[in-house]
Design a protein with these regions (language model features):
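Amphipathic alpha-helical
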Residues: 100-124
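Short acidic-glycine loop/turn motifs at beta-strand connectors
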Residues: 3, 32-37, 158-159, 244-246
Length: 297
């Protein structure tokens, strides 16, 4: 799909501004029959601001087909506590859940486990997450926010320390803070704070080495459901992927659940890959969490 748009904002404080926005995206889904008759499906996509950045359509199809075929013969595993390696797309999902707790609206509603924790070291030194609306050519890039405030780069986590929340003018006023230029809005919606381009800063470890450091564990490629409580940080999601044995991918895994607490998960990130990958306006590398509960048989 393609879209060409123009965002313009005029407000009662005398602000006038506009900027163009283009998007192009392609998604491919593949379906295969397993030996027991179950349907296995996988997909891949590419979404960019310009055509020259879009992944080759043939490559998108090949990745979708491979991700589907690799699931054939998937099975459950016994309940255990093991390391879990998040592929980049799954790391982006985890980051999205986390940053949803770092908005001013979550703070003033009392719906975040990060309340009263600004400045606290919650994650390992490998955890650095930024929201950067000034990156050239990215989906969330914009010169001003939904209230006409000049945008800026905001470091949400730096070397494991939680730096603070993303605010628009309203939530900043409600909580006694200053706006971070993070207001988002639609044509018919009121502003609310949210991220622009989220980046989990990569490390320097190849993903193969991260997997190779696991004796027994899960390589996560699928998450299902919405089992995350932002107020408490309790995390529980349906999951699938591949079992790791002696540092190698052994077999596909399905119908399991992974669970933990978000702050404990951040404190358990012991490896961050060099493979930073973009998915829309968010980017993350491979991550490894030292231990999560994998519930299966």
């Amino acid at each position: 799909s393609t879209r060409i748009g123009h965002f313009a904002l005029v407000n009662s404080l005398g602000f006038e501004g506009a900027y163009p926005a283009t998007t192009i995206s392609l998604v491919v889904e593949a379906i295969a029959d397993d030996a027991d008759g179950k349907k296995r499906n996988g997909y891949w996509y590419s979404a960019e601001r310009s055509l020259h950045r879009l992944l080759d359509p043939g490559e998108i199809g090949r990745i979708a087909a491979r991700r589907t075929l690799d699931q054939l013969g998937a099975r459950k595993v016994p309940t255990c506590q093991v390391p879990v390696v998040f592929e980049p797309m799954m790391a982006v999902s985890l980051m999205g859940d986390l940053v949803g707790c770092a908005t001013g609206s979550a703070l003033y509603r009392g719906a975040t486990f990060l309340a009263n924790r600004t400045g606290e070291v919650i994650g390992t030194p490998l955890v650095t997450i930024t929201d950067d609306p000034l990156l050239p050519g990215r989906f969330g890039s914009r010169p001003f926010d939904g209230e006409g405030v000049t945008t800026r780069r905001n470091a949400i986590f730096s070397a494991g320390a939680f730096n603070g929340f993303l605010f628009d003018c309203y939530t900043a006023r409600r909580t006694g803070n200053q706006t971070t230029g993070s207001a988002q809005r639609g044509i018919e919606s009121t502003p609310s704070p949210g991220p622009s381009n989220l980046v989990f800063e990569p490390g320097d470890t190849p993903p193969e080495e991260i997997i190779g450091g696991v004796t027994n564990g899960l390589y996560l490629t699928t998450l299902m459901g919405s089992g995350f409580n932002p107020a408490t940080g309790d995390y529980s999601r349906g999951a699938g992927g591949f079992w790791i044995e002696s540092g190698r991918i052994a077999f596909p895994v399905t119908e399991v659940n992974i669970s933990g607490r978000m702050d404990t998960m951040l404190a358990g990130i012991d490896a961050v890959g060099a493979d930073l990958s973009w998915f829309g306006s968010n980017a993350a590398p491979t991550l490894r969490i030292r231990e999560l509960t994998v519930s299966g048989i």
